[in-house]
Amino acid sequence: MQTQRASLSLGRWSLWLLLLGLVVPSASAQALSYREAVLRAVDQLNELSSEANLYRLLELDPPPKDNEDLGTRKPVSFTVKETVCPRTIQQPAEQCDFKEKGRVKQCVGTVTLDPSNDQFDLNCNELQSVILPWKWPWWPWRRG
């Protein structure tokens, strides 16, 4: 009697493991969206950064119009902005407010949509604000 119960229990566990094995690969094979892939790249940039504060996605250019092949590198272009959260904090950058007058960086490169592949190739450069010299308008003192 005891042997039959143990055998039945083992059979149930085997069935559960089989079902779990069928479900897990299909879940991991789903491609990341273009935005999700970029957000993962921003997270990696924050981890590798030596700057004091985290950066957060500010603007994302439209995705390329090509196939959804997981392994293919996709070109990306986006801007990130410095947040008020220190880099040492264990908080997602998406939950941090942008820093007033924080640095803004333009990033270009490639990412993959494969959730098991965190490889990306990005180059981010700080955008410099352009200050135009203000001149007095000439028209009020126009001579006729």
UniProtKB/Swiss-Prot annotation:
Record PTM text: Elastase might be responsible for its maturation.
Disulfide cross-links: 85-96, 107-124
Propeptide part(s) removed at maturation, as residue ranges: 30-130
Signal peptide: 1-29
Highest taxon listed in the record's lineage: Eukaryota
Subcellular location: Secreted
Arginine amide, modified sites: 143
UniProt-listed SUPFAM superfamilies: Cystatin/monellin
GO cellular component, one term: extracellular space
Record's keyword terms, sorted: Amidation, Antibiotic, Antimicrobial, Disulfide bond, Fungicide, Secreted, Signal
Gene Ontology biological-process annotations: antimicrobial humoral immune response mediated by antimicrobial peptide; defense response to fungus; defense response to Gram-negative bacterium; defense response to Gram-positive bacterium; innate immune response; killing of cells of another organism
Tissue expression profile of the protein: Large granules of neutrophils.
Alphabetical list of InterPro entries matching this protein: Cathelicidin-like (IPR001894), Cathelicidin_CS (IPR018216), Cystatin_sf (IPR046350)
Role of this protein: Potent microbicidal activity; active against S.aureus and E.coli.
Family to which this protein belongs: Belongs to the cathelicidin family.
Protein name: Cathelicidin-4
Organism expressing this protein natively: Bos taurus (Bovine)
